[in-house]
């Protein structure tokens, strides 16, 4: 395949993509999903590769320009996700570049910064000693270290008005400002990891007690060096001895930042389902095994056990080698479901929402991208999760208006979930005690299959509701006497 020409999506409010030529020295790095820096008019912009080996339109052959940079590292999305991104672009009338910018979490994207570079005139001025003083010093710095940002130049000359000097040099044509990639906003976290080179159970002769203690600690798997420091006295000395005898290895490795921490509850078994829950799970399971697109609306009263249906369906998807995406309308609602899903599926669960730090978002995205977390739980933006083998999408509280994004790419996560499931042959399961009218109508018309849980677990009654006519209370009263007495009783009961 000819990889000399690529298509790039740029985050601009213009339709279409742009063709660029890849220089020979960069062609080995080309892949869909990689970030690139390209010239665009007089600017340098960062975008994403969306096609490789494209046929160049005849009218562009003479004017095509070269790619300037390609970011190292893994691609951030694949062709599977690109199909979904293109649909979003077409349906919501947003450029493909803007869709991709919205989809990729902040911690994964590279950022551009303004870099100062010498022009040919600037290089001549230095050679001919036409520039002197503070201007000459800045030019000499840029000659020795090309491509510096304003902050880096300020650090070298803290007592100078660097911005004024650079503006003067730019007006004289001695330097120019360009956009360059600075790398991801959040870099991988690397820590020192110790791993045993001796197979578990194999006896090693002439070990000191401390050495045997360390090997026993490593029998279950690699450990962070910092975690062992508080458990073994004089650890550094004993580690050096074990390394010298080739019994352990110490290396700097990428370690994920975990937004939730290790599960504090042991993995639990699934409770026994009610007949109504069993019927719902059976229907979803059959669709999962068929491996074709299906959509379900789970209408269940509050307390009827919809969450347990989600958990059981997720277990079926995992058994089939497929992945599950669970959407909730708001970040605040993720905590409850997160505890339940992590209890059932432990470290296989990843969390995605804007409340995470950039580093956490980057690490969770990469865990999902690498297939290490087959269950993803998150708010609206988790619909973009880079799942390659998506089998089930759960949309909890599908009626909630928070699924609608009101800025930028104005997508509705529930509607996007239905289309993503359709594009990937997955099953979408939407649940609510009060379904949206549009969803319920779709179910009545047969577009969605209606599943119902009309009864609460153990036939528990719904909480009583009393309507108080506040017109009968004194003017200015906010809390009625019955509510005040109920609050007092609740506080007294602890």
Residue ranges of predicted features:
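Accessory, non-ATPase domains that flank or precede helicase/AAA+ motor cores in DNA-metabolism machines
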Residues: 1-432, 439, 444-460, 492-493
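Short amphipathic
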Residues: 464-471
């Amino acid at each position: 395949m000819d990889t000399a020409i690529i298509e790039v999506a740029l985050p601009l409010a213009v339709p279409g993509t742009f063709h660029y030529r890849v220089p020979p020295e960069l062609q080995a790095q080309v892949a869909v999903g990689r970030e690139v820096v390209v010239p665009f008019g007089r600017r340098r912009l960062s975008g994403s590769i969306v096609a490789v080996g494209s046929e160049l339109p005849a009218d562009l052959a003479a004017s095509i320009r070269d790619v300037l940079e390609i970011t190292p590292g893994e691609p951030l999305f694949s062709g599977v996700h690109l199909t979904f991104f293109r649909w979003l672009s077409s349906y919501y009338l947003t450029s493909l570049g803007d869709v991709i910018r919205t989809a990729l979490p902040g911690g994964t994207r590279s950022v551009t910064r303004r870099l100062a570079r010498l022009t040919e005139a600037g290089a001549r001025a230095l050679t001919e000693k036409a520039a002197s003083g503070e201007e000459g010093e800045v030019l000499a710095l840029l000659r020795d270290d090309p491509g510096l940002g304003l902050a880096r130049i300020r650090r070298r000359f803290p007592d100078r008005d660097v911005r004024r000097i650079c503006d003067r040099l730019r007006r004289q044509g001695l330097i120019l400002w360009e956009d360059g990639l600075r790398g991801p906003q959040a870099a991988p976290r690397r820590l020192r990891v110790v791993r045993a080179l001796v197979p578990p159970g194999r006896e090693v002769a002439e070990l000191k007690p401390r050495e045997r203690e360390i090997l026993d600690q490593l029998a279950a798997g690699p450990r962070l060096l910092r975690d062992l420091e508080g458990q073994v006295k004089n650890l550094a000395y004993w580690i050096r001895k074990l390394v010298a005898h080739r019994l352990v290895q110490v290396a700097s490795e990428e370690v994920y930042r975990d937004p939730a921490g290790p599960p504090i509850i042991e993995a639990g078994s699934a409770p026994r389902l009610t007949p109504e829950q069993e019927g719902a799970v059976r229907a979803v399971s059959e669709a999962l095994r068929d491996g074709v697109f299906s959509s379900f609306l789970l209408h269940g009263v509050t307390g009827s056990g919809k969450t347990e249906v989600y958990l059981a369906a997720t277990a079926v998807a995992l058994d089939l080698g497929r992945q599950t995406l669970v959407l909730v309308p708001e970040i605040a609602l993720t905590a409850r479901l997160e505890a339940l899903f992590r209890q059932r599926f432990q470290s296989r669960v990843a969390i995605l929402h804007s409340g995470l730090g950039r580093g956490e978002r980057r690490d969770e995205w990469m865990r999902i991208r690498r297939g290490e977390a087959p269950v993803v739980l998150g708010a609206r933006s988790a619909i973009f999760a880079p799942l390659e083998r998506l089998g089930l999408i759960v949309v909890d509280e599908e009626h909630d208006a928070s699924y609608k994004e009101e800025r930028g790419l104005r997508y509705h996560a529930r509607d996007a979930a239905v289309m993503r499931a359709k594009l990937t042959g997955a099953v979408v399961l939407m649940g609510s005690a009060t379904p949206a009218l549009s969803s319920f109508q779709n179910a009545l018309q047969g577009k969605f299959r209606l599943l119902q849980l009309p009864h609460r677990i153990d036939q528990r009654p719904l909480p009583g509701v009393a309507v108080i006519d506040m017109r009968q209370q004194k003017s200015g009263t906010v809390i009625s006497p019955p509510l005040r007495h109920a609050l007092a009783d609740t506080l007294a009961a602890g």
